[in-house]
Each structure stands twice: as structure tokens, then as C-alpha cells.
């Protein structure tokens, strides 16, 4: 499992999780009717900066990551935690 602060949130008609890591980065993992992949039961991931805002300037991605299965979510969370 990923160590770091995690908060479950209700978002639109679905749910999400906000992660915060010791390196100052975090992640938003969501599944709702407007997220990329929700129609297939998949997640959308965003990298967050230390203020909790979307961060588009990491080696991981310059956008959100859609259509992520659970393995992709876990891999991406590990990568964010290791930045």
C-alpha cells in the first residue's frame, strides 16, 4: 500500500482520493461521470503540487492521466511519491 496522507472525497456523482506525500507532491485519483475512463470503471489521476493544485511540470505527465486501472494508479502513486 502507499504510505502518505490519504483523504476520501465525494466528487460530483462519484468519489476520489487525495494523497499527500512527504516530498511535497500529492495526487488526486478520481472516478466520476466526467473523469477520463469512468465509463469503463477506470480512474483519472492528477499530480498535485504542495498547495494541492494540479501540477503539469513533472517527468510523470504534463496533463492528467486517464483510463488508469488499479495497477496503473498504484504505479503512478509510487512514482509521484519518489519525485
Residue locations for each model-derived region?
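Catalytic phosphate/metal-binding cores of nucleic-acid and nucleotide-processing enzymes, i.e., regions
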Residues: 1-83
Amino acid at each position: 500500500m502507499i504510505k502518505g496522507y490519504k483523504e476520501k472525497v465525494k466528487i460530483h456523482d462519484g468519489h476520489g482520493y487525495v494523497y499527500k506525500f512527504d516530498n511535497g507532491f500529492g495526487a488526486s485519483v478520481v472516478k466520476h461521470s466526467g473523469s477520463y475512463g469512468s465509463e469503463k470503471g477506470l480512474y483519472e489521476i492528477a499530480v498535485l503540487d504542495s498547495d494541492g493544485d494540479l501540477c503539469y511540470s513533472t517527468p510523470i505527465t504534463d496533463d492528467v492521466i486517464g483510463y488508469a486501472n488499479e495497477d496503473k494508479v498504484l504505479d503512478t502513486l509510487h512514482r509521484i511519491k519518489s519525485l
